[in-house]
Amino acid sequence: MIKVVVDTGITVSAAFRDRTPEEVILFIVEQEEFEWIISPAVLEEYTEVLARKKFNLSPEILQKWREMFEHFTTMIEPDIEIDFPRDQKDAKLLECALAGEADYLITGDKDFTEARKLVQTTIISVSQFKQLIVDKWS
């Protein structure tokens, strides 16, 4: 099983039907060999950010994403805390990746460059993941 953590920014981009993020997320949920890992803190961030007024997502789209999180993710309870001074709010994603023994953390956030020495997880952009994994797998 290939375990993946997806940064909130990638999820938001996919909700707006941005082609590459949406394609990558659909690939992850459709392939039995892949597991999308989240924690309660990550789920809370996903739902809070997607519901922000500035994004103006319809109730139907928000419901679609809530259902996707419910049915196509694996919830874990990280029992570790990571001090990530670069951006402490991103620590929850690193904790999820570490506790869930994720193979990949997909992000567009440059702050995670410094995190490479904190986790064994491969930190990769959505376009790199598409090129290295999705395009070769399909």
Segments predicted by a language model, with ranges:
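Metal-dependent nucleic-acid phosphoesterase active-site entry motif
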Residues: 1-19
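PIN/NYN-family metal-dependent endoribonuclease catalytic core
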Residues: 6, 21-51
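A secondary-structure boundary/capping signal
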Residues: 6-8, 38-39, 108-109, 125
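Alpha-helix capping/helix-boundary segments
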Residues: 10-11, 42, 111-112
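Residues at secondary-structure transition points
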Residues: 20, 37, 60, 84, ...
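Membrane interface segments of multi-pass transport proteins and intramembrane proteases
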Residues: 55-58
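Active-site neighborhoods of divalent-metal-dependent phosphate/nucleic-acid chemistry enzymes
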Residues: 71-104
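Acidic, PIN/NYN-like endoribonuclease modules and their adjacent C-terminal/linker elements
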Residues: 100, 110-138
